[in-house]
């Protein structure tokens, strides 16, 4: 994978580079390292690399989904109501679309994300 140093691209361009990087990592880089570790008798290290491959593959899947949302113009919209949370102040609202700005702290829509309730 290549990462153009010093360049800040568009969200679309950055996601495309990230997708390419993750793909390279799980299809070539880590499998090569796992094979080498296995060949040299380091089974635990090879197993760790195989588990990292699973994580990298998931990263690619997530970035592909994000790119799809960005390209469709529906990054801050869903077909059904969900909870949106402001990453700045924590304000939560249930809606199909994130607010244009946070009614609590006045930060723009870009500070909202689907709320994670994983505790």
Task: Give names to the regions the model predicted.
Residues 1-119:
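Non-heme di-metal
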């Amino acid at each position: 994978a290549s990462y153009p140093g010093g360049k800040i691209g568009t969200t679309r361009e950055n996601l495309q580079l990230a997708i390419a990087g993750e793909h390279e990592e799980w299809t070539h880089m880590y499998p090569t390292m796992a094979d080498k570790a296995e060949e040299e008798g380091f089974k635990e290290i090879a197993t760790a690399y195989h588990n990292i491959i699973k994580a990298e593959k998931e990263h690619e899947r997530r970035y592909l989904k994000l790119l799809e949302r960005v390209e469709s113009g529906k990054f801050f919209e869903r077909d059904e109501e969900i909870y949106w949370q402001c990453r700045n102040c924590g304000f939560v609202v249930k809606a199909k679309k994130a607010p244009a700005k946070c009614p609590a702290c006045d930060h723009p829509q870009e500070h909202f994300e689907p709320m994670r309730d994983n505790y």
